[in-house]
């Protein structure tokens, strides 16, 4: 047990934990927040805000591809 804890607290283990956390944030957390933001603001955004949206989609594109098979962002049907 001490060996495992010592390995995780060493510089290499700490660096691996930081890389894992950052990669999970880049591939899952930020794209999920971006999907939510785009869904809420897409039809009411100003032109500058839309430019920022396009940049964020470009920046987090790999994560958006990872999440795309499980999300459905089609517009809702209009009430008839």
Swiss-Prot record:
Per its database record, what is this protein's job? Answer: NDH-1 shuttles electrons from an unknown electron donor, via FMN and iron-sulfur (Fe-S) centers, to quinones in the respiratory and/or the photosynthetic chain. The immediate electron acceptor for the enzyme in this species is believed to be plastoquinone. Couples the redox reaction to proton translocation, and thus conserves the redox energy in a proton gradient. Cyanobacterial NDH-1 also plays a role in inorganic carbon-concentration.
User: What InterPro entries does the entry give?
Assistant: NADH-quinone_OxRdatse_su_L (IPR019654)
HAMAP family in the record: NDH1_NDH1L
Could you list the residue ranges forming a coiled coil in this record? none
The organism's lineage is: Bacteria, Bacillati, Cyanobacteriota, Cyanophyceae, Synechococcales
Locations listed in the record? Cellular thylakoid membrane
**Gene that this polypeptide is encoded by:** ndhL
**Cellular component terms, GO, for this chain's entry?**
plasma membrane-derived thylakoid membrane
Full protein name: NAD(P)H-quinone oxidoreductase subunit L
Q: Where are the transmembrane segments?
A: 14-34, 51-71
Substrates-to-products reaction catalysed: a plastoquinone + NADH + (n+1) H(+)(in) = a plastoquinol + NAD(+) + n H(+)(out); a plastoquinone + NADPH + (n+1) H(+)(in) = a plastoquinol + NADP(+) + n H(+)(out)
The similarity annotation says:
Belongs to the complex I NdhL subunit family.
How does this protein lie in the membrane? Multi-pass membrane protein
Which keywords describe this protein according to UniProt? Membrane, NAD, NADP, Plastoquinone, Quinone, Thylakoid, Translocase, Transmembrane, Transmembrane helix, Transport
EC no.? Answer: 7.1.1.-
Using the UniProt record, give the first listed, main subcellular location. Answer: membrane
Q: How does it assemble?
A: NDH-1 can be composed of about 15 different subunits; different subcomplexes with different compositions have been identified which probably have different functions.
């Amino acid at each position: 047990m001490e060996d495992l804890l010592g390995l995780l607290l060493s510089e290499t283990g700490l660096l691996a934990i930081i890389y894992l956390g950052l990669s999970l944030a880049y591939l899952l957390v930020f794209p999920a927040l971006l999907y939510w933001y785009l869904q809420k603001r897409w039809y009411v955004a100003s032109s500058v805000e839309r430019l920022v949206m396009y940049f964020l989609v470009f920046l987090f594109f790999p994560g958006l591809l990872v999440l795309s098979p499980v999300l459905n962002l089609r517009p809702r049907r209009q009430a008839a």
